[in-house]
Amino acid sequence: MENAKWLRWMVVFLGIAGISYLLYMNLNRPEVAMEPEDEKMLADKNGLVGDGIADDTAALQAAINEVPPGGTLKLPDGIYKVSRNPDLKAVTGYGESHFALEITNPLTIEMDEVTIKTETDGRYGIFWIHDTADVHLKGGSLIGDKFPRDAELTSNIAVLLHETQNSTIENTYTKNHSQGIHLHDADNNLIRNVTSEYNYGSGIINFSSNNNIIDSCVVRNSSDGHLSLYGVGENNTVVNCVVTEDRPDHTIEQGITVESEKNSRIENNTVSGFYYGIDIKNGAESNIITSNNVFDNEYNIAIRPGDGGENLLTPSHDIVITNNFATNPRGNSHFGIFVDIGEGHVITGNTVNKGNLIITDPKMFAKYEKQNSYVD
């Protein structure tokens, strides 16, 4: 009798344990994301052509809109022509911009072997990513059909990250836009392995945005500060980038600009071919410029008031310039490191040519002259 009672309780106990386990596994089962191949089928369903001739704007937008939040859209290989959508107008503190496509939900777009092209004279960009987070663009070439000679700085932006957080743009190529990548009031984002060239304005610009990382990017043959931190952003990092200008008739361009920026870091970049290589100006404060290789610029590294005109000429303070190679400025220039304004700067551990450390404040020059290295 006792054995039978014991067996009944054991059966009840095992049943409860089994049900509890099943409930636990069901409640804690991870979400199953759609496979990229499923997303490819979704894209095909929307009638993507990808021959570079047909207008794929509506089909691309439909495919983007059908991706569930957090899902992945893998675009089939091809060349996608897009046109200006009159309903997509971004208004920022930098100006107005029109676009072909918009993204307003978290998603990933994989664009291996994909080219999206615009007609430059239409004055529009490609992706307007706004009021969202966790958007990831991977791969792809975003190309205007010709250099935008009659553009404005915001008329043809390849990708605008606008009030968007925690997003990434990786392994993407842009060419022939007014700006390549523009971050505007966009925080905690990553721009990595992006190449942007032949822009009317900046290849990459971080405007009034914080805590962003620009890593291992190439910006070439653009303008207006090829890679620009501007508009009172804070705690941004530019690292491992190559910024260069090699057009013989472009001698007044700026490389990396740090303008009205605070507590940001410019590290281990290579900058060459500019009038101002690394250009700190207009109220920049407490930024670190370290371990960069800056050469063949009229001014390799400069702390100066600004460009004049409509720009502010506010002094910059507490800039740390340390452990940089700022040798061989172009032509007969002797401006390896040029410090013309501000207080509280730290200038140590740099290598320049003899006579190429120019600090206009005599006391500051006397303090730091022997804390740097000189080569012939």
What are these regions (language model features)?
Residues 1-13:
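N-terminal Sec-pathway targeting helices
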Residues 71, 84-85, 118-124, 146-152, ...:
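Short glycine/acidic-rich loop motifs that flank beta-strands on beta-rich extracellular proteins
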Residues 27-39:
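Ser/Thr/Pro/Gly-rich low-complexity linker/stalk segments immediately outside membranes or between
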Residues 333-376:
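Leucine-rich solenoid repeat scaffolds
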Residues 140, 167, 172, 189, ...:
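Consensus "Asn ladder" position of solenoid repeat domains
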Residues 60-69, 81-110, 116-138, 145-166, ...:
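Extracellular beta-strand-rich solenoid/capping regions of secreted or surface-exposed proteins
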